[in-house]
Regions:
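Short, functional N-terminal and low-complexity linear motifs
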Residues: 7-10, 60-63, 145-152, 170-176
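The identity of the second residue at the extreme N-terminus of proteins
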Residues: 2-3, 230
């Protein structure tokens, strides 16, 4: 069992003190997919936070692309914790910061862009390509939110093309640019942003302290941090 005073626990063995009060600040996880957003969602659910409707958010991709933030702000008013698209897309964090003052932002990251790219490729190869790198046609017919949604997301958010939907340089550049823009935006407000690699020892303690919660020696449910599920 982990101890609050230890710096060795990760999101797998965090301890907590019951559910969080739902009257605190909103929390937006603005890291790219495959950086631990699923684990963070599980963490905040286990802490008692009201987690936003991910499907509803992902269906606002086209609104994000036209910078129509009104429906995204409306979704932001509906819960306390949010992750994945459109909240982790460029420009959304600024809109949420203005719409919901005193919110907390968590930028989840991997060790570097190469590691993030590898995780994305492995996940899509397993999920969509059934053992091979998906083609644009595979992405057009894959029924996630609707057929073609994943290809649209890759093109709109990361700037890839139909000809090269997994162009390494384009994807890594977009990933790193977003991270840099987030850190630059919050550079004078360290109380508002936590940059975290969830595989680091002590990550769970840092996250819980960042959102202002206390916890004691009660083991929290296991969180899956395998490479294919972050």
């Amino acid at each position: 069992m982990a101890s609050h005073n230890s710096s060795d626990s990760t999101l797998d063995d965090t301890i907590m003190d019951g559910p969080a009060k739902l009257c605190g600040p909103k929390i937006f996880c603005i890291g790219a997919g495959k950086t631990g957003t699923t684990s963070l969602e599980s963490l905040f659910k286990s802490l008692g936070f009201h987690v936003g409707d991910q499907e509803r958010g992902e269906l606002l991709l086209k609104e994000w692309a036209t910078r129509n933030f009104a429906p995204i702000v409306s979704l932001g008013a509906s819960a306390q914790f949010f992750q994945d698209m459109p909240f982790n897309c460029p420009f959304t964090f600024q809109a949420m910061d203005m719409a919901f003052p005193n919110s907390k932002f968590i930028l989840s990251v991997r060790d570097d862009g190469e590691q993030w790219f590898g995780s994305l490729i492995r996940f899509h190869t397993k999920l969509i390509g059934k053992g091979r790198l998906p083609t644009a046609e595979d992405l057009r017919v894959f029924p996630y939110r609707y057929a073609g949604w994943i290809l649209e997301a890759l093109k709109l958010v990361y700037g890839v093309t139909d000809e090269e939907p997994y162009r390494k340089e384009t994807l890594i550049t977009a990933y790193e640019r977003h991270n840099d823009e987030v850190k630059r935006y919050f550079r004078y407000r360290s109380e508002s942003l936590l940059v975290i690699n969830i595989s680091d020892k002590g990550a769970a303690e840092r996250i819980i302290e960042f959102v202002g919660l206390d916890y004691h020696d009660e083991l929290m449910p296991h969180l899956n941090r395998s490479d294919d599920n972050v």
